[in-house]
Swiss-Prot record:
Its EC number is 7.1.1.-. It comes from the Bacteria. The lineage of its organism: Bacteria, Pseudomonadati, Pseudomonadota, Alphaproteobacteria, Hyphomicrobiales. It is a peripheral membrane protein. The keyword Cell inner membrane applies. This is NADH-quinone oxidoreductase subunit D. InterPro entries: NADH_Q_OxRdtase_suD, NADH_UbQ_OxRdtase_49kDa_CS, NDH1_su_D/H, NiFe-Hase_large.
């Protein structure tokens, strides 16, 4: 009887693979078609964001956050603004809080639509992404009408938002909700009820409650395992404690459960959007959209045409910026991909001393090796899709 030495072979997945979610390079060690080891190589989109922020004023640093998770930009700005507001003790007007809450939920729809439909494309269904991008286009137009930009909005400000929403935009957001829910139902039938989609996703990448905690997962990754942990409920910020919505949780902790949760979260986001629209129309929802503290918010433009003091105030605010009291703070938001946190250290000057960004995708990607082990090569893209990785925030 002859002996054969069976040697595992290694292949590269990415960084230019369509399912690699950006610039991910995975070095896969395979025994036949079974995955033995996954080695993620990150850093191909590293831009030194945290260091760049240290050399910018607080206002100039805000646009960097759009470029982290570029699928849902405003959610990232939100965490940075919350951190500054907590350090400086800035009070945000109610209308600004409502607008922020509304656009964070629009960001959640943008992210989940992309993830669920491209997950279907990764397993071979080509129609859902076309439907998803059609809806995302409408949401991006809302972004554009609010901030002037489709993608990198730079709309949130410490103390509020940049501009008020026109009444027609609020009406259009309300009109968007009902037809969108029908599209979600159609996607449910087309994707979630599809037997091939189920065969490819059920019992793949199972994560238990203890494992989710041990790996430092957040967002859909913990809710898929049955833990109802959502910062909007457990540590409410802005006006989420006033909103009525449910937290969908899974029971199997597999890839399929996580995608079902994303579908349900889109329905819950629409609920929150409707409540925000209703509250924006109430008398209590009227008023300023930025802090009335002149140290942090610029004067109205009409005043700058008449008042020399207002012009000087505006000039100082946009050249030197405002000074944040010395201290350190951690602010986190429930971004679509998980807990997005900003640890901000101020030395009392007009620039952050240190700004550490806690990206949810970074914690999720480290579990790639453990989740894929023993699965087939074809399942790697399913597991990667369910982690919902965006490389802007992983590499920073």
């Amino acid at each position: 009887m002859t002996e054969h030495n069976i040697r595992n072979f290694s292949i590269n997945f990415g960084p230019q693979h369509p399912a690699a979610h950006g610039v991910l390079r995975l070095v896969l060690e395979l025994d036949g078609e079974v995955v033995e080891r996954v080695d993620p190589h990150i850093g191909l989109l590293h831009r030194g964001t945290e260091k760049l922020i240290e050399h910018k004023t607080y206002l100039q640093a805000t646009p960097y956050f759009d470029r982290l998770d570029y699928v849902a930009p405003m959610n990232q700005e939100h965490a940075f603004c919350l951190a500054i507001e907590r350090l400086a003790g800035i009070e945000v007007p109610r209308r600004a809080q409502l607008i922020r809450t509304l656009f964070c939920e629009i960001g959640r729809l943008l992210s989940h639509l992309l993830n669920v439909t491209t997950q279907a494309m990764d397993v071979g269904a080509l129609t859902p992404p076309l439907w998803g991008f059609e809806e995302r286009e409408k949401l991006m137009i809302f972004y554009e009408r609010a901030s002037g930009a489709r993608l990198h909005a730079n709309y949130f400000r410490p103390g509020g938002v940049h501009q008020d929403l026109p009444p027609a935009l609020i009406d259009d957001i309300e009109a968007f909700c009902d037809p969108f829910l029908k599209v979600v139902d159609d996607l449910d039938n087309l994707v979630m009820a599809n037997r091939i989609f189920k065969q490819r996703n059920v019992d793949i990448g199972i994560v238990s409650v203890d494992e989710a905690m041990a790996w430092g997962f957040s967002g859909v990754m913990v809710r898929g395992s049955g833990i109802p942990w959502d910062l909007r409920k457990s540590q409410p910020y802005e006006l989420y404690e006033e909103m009525e919505f449910d937290i969908p949780v899974g029971k199997n902790g597999d890839t399929y459960d996580r995608q079902v949760i994303r579908m349900e979260e889109m329905r819950e986001s629409v609920k929150i959007m409707r409540q925000c629209v209703a509250k924006l129309r109430e008398p209590a929802g009227q008023g300023p959209i930025a802090s009335i503290d002149g140290k942090f918010a610029p004067p109205p433009r009409r005043e700058m045409k008449r008042s020399m003091e207002a012009l000087i105030h505006h000039f100082k605010l946009y050249t030197e910026g405002f000074h944040v009291p010395e201290g350190e703070v951690y602010a986190a938001v429930e971004a679509p991909k998980g807990e997005f946190g900003v640890y901000l250290v101020s030395d009392g000057t007009n620039k952050p001393y240190r700004c550490k960004i806690r990206a949810p995708g970074f914690a999720h990607l480290q579990a790639m090796d453990w989740m894929c082990r023993g699965h087939l090569l074809a399942d790697v893209s399913c597991v990667l899709g369910t982690l919902d990785i965006v490389f802007g925030e992983v590499d920073r």
